[in-house]
Amino acid sequence: MVFSHRNVEKKWQQYWEQNKTFKTSEDEGKKKFYALDMFPYPSGAGLHVGHPEGYTATDILSRMKRMQGYNVLHPMGWDAFGLPAEQYALDTGNDPAEFTEHNINTFRRQIKSLGFSYDWDREINTTDPHYYKWTQWIFTKLYEHGLAYIDEVAVNWCPALGTVLANEEVIDGKSERGGHPVERRPMKQWVLKITAYAERLLADLDELDWPESIKEMQRNWIGRSEGAEVTFGIEGHDESFTVFTTRPDTLYGATYAVLAPEHKLVEQITVPAQKEAVEAYLDQAKRKSDLERTDLAKEKTGVFTGAYAINPVNGERLPIWIADYVLISYGTGSIMAVPAHDERDYEFAKTFDLPIKQVIAGGDISKEAYAGDGEHINSGMLDGLNKEQAISKMIEWLEAEGKGNRKVTYRLRDWLFSRQRYWGEPIPILHLEDGTMKVVPESELPIMLPKTKEIKPSGTGESPLANIAEWVNTIDPETGMKARRETNTMPQWAGSCWYFLRFIDPHNDKALADPDKLKEWLPIDIYIGGAEHAVLHLLYSRFWHKFLYDIGVVPTKEPFQKLFNQGMILGENNEKMSKSKGNVVNPDDIIDSHGADTLRMYEMFMGPLDASIAWSTKGLDGARRFLDRVYRLFVGDNGELNEKIVETSNVAGMERVYHQTVKKVTEDYEGLRFNTGISQLMVFVNEAYKAEVLPKKFMEDFVKMLSPIAPHLGEELWEKLGHSESVAYAAWPTYDEAKLVEDEVEIVLQINGKNKEKLLIASDSTKEQMEEMAKNNEMINELIEGKTIVKVIAVPGKLVNIVVR
């Protein structure tokens, strides 16, 4: 007999919705648990089977914590701004808002069909003006605190499309759409000063319960380096340039300098004879992405400016070159080259026949650069010193001479925040007719995104909003001056930087969230999502959160106390699921054929939650068979409760497996080891099928432990057991440590180390009692008759070995 998943799931989903079963409780005196999923971008493709893996994990924890008496916050929403909707709108002429709403409705239906215990009254959508009012408000605060500024930044400009492209839209120097040439062009952009928080973003990682691999990725992205800034004068010019180096001790080995093609001094210092060559090189460089420019495998290119820098430590003339492997966005946009001890500088020097001067003993620099340690040579005052001594001495000298200073730098760049797009949050800035700019007053927020059919690029590099004159041109309500609205919009990251705060108080129109509620719910106890957000989303969120902490909006320094990355569900052929490969599994199909509980159970039983595992239809069938077996254990052929389930004090047959199951399942759910927790539920079911009598309390508690994984079946069985209330708030079972110990244990009796007999004895038997039992055993007595006992070895709980001759 099998249960009808379609009927059961529909019945309980309606019950939960009508009764608002999962409305967040905020009872005083209860502990809190905030379980958060990385909310999805509602794409046109709908949910795939990878989404429910993480969602089921947080749902199991949320359901268990409710039963353990916690106030649980378990919300869901939509990260709904972004490029795909705008692209769709451009291609079809449809409104991205309508497209997005349609996709959200699909996602919501699919997620509800999986029985997740979300509080749908807290649903948020980043494209809702009630939500993005507060995204804009945070921007105004960043601006007021000097953390949002306008800068000239090199962007990917596509003349044919008349728009700026994101890095991921450029492939091999051409636009992904249409294959048009793309070039690098400096444009005024909004930038957020995340670098002001670099040190704290780095240091506070140590306090977080996150996978070490993710913390390491963030550390590398922030990229802290200690070294010195050194100033180089330019022969025949008043100007100078600064380089940052982690190895100021190698300054004596510098033989040339390199500027990025975009460096502001290039035009000034290039000599007339080199002008044509330099201009041709600059034109070539602007067609390449940063990634292409810094590729170590590519051949080094460059051009000489004809100008010379002066080495501050020895007065030597260093030719100044331009090369595209130096980026203006990284460091100071200029480097001192020490080819004897740096592989990239060495290759460049060999290509252009530049001098190579060894200043650290070791290696063979006629063959390759020597990057190892050694004594300093050819280095004047540093000769004979090791690396640490020489770095320290050189920095002291530079500071004393006014030629440089000790410096800590970060690989982390300030965050390029503006997008030349329509489908994003408008940036709340007014450009006044007197040339000044200011934030829009809070009373005027939100600045609504205007509805328009015209979302094609402006052609000027501004966003399509620049085309809407009646929206752009306005009056500043405070000064009465004419003003132009900022036409750039925010990136998709903006809305996801703080959404977890809005879930705490989603309908507040007076503040981002009530401070008392933020105090009650933060930090997030568990955050589960894919590792693809390891760096940017998590780093940006931490940055905004720290800023909000500094201005007194949030009570914690960090948003996410514990983070867990679920693995990827691959296609049956072990390849990543994708439409093009035709191996995508649609959850709607599985819910129809096998049921939502089966899908949840299977995804949790596939293997460790953080492993990437191939989808298996056999495994799915196995999960369904187990749930049918559970149903038959509780429900007879007549549809009534199994007669073996009774109120009884005779629990001997099931007692130990019951306490073992409660202990293991509780600990495994807490530790996100759902696959081994399910294995223990299977052990319980196997024992239950063998038992003559099934104590009702044990069976009820089994249903409680099953229900976080298979909630629809859990509710159905709970009702069959005679309950009129949902199982969702039934008290989570507890175990007795004393009942986990086996009363009896099987031991082996050996003669001269060979197994001869097995014996059941009391588990607390002493060595002496074990020896006595062995000697009195009939079979053993027969086998040792007439022999001399040399010694008897007893190992409690395991064996007795009688040595005879």
UniProtKB/Swiss-Prot annotation:
It is an enzyme of class 6 (ligase). A motif ('KMSKS' region) lies at residues 576-580. InterPro entries: aa-tRNA-synth_I_CS, aa-tRNA-synth_Ia, Leu-tRNA-ligase, Leu_tRNA-synth_edit, M/V/L/I-tRNA-synth_anticd-bd, Methionyl/Leucyl_tRNA_Synth, Rossmann-like_a/b/a_fold, tRNAsynth_Ia_anticodon-bd. Its main location: cytoplasm. ATP binds at residue 579. It catalyses: tRNA(Leu) + L-leucine + ATP = L-leucyl-tRNA(Leu) + AMP + diphosphate. Disulfide bonds: none annotated. A motif ('HIGH' region) lies at residues 40-51. Transmembrane segments: none annotated. Its EC number is 6.1.1.4. PROSITE patterns: AA_TRNA_LIGASE_I. It is found in: Cytoplasm. One of its GO terms (molecular function) is ATP binding. It holds the Pfam family tRNA-synt_1_2. Belongs to the class-I aminoacyl-tRNA synthetase family. This is Leucine--tRNA ligase.
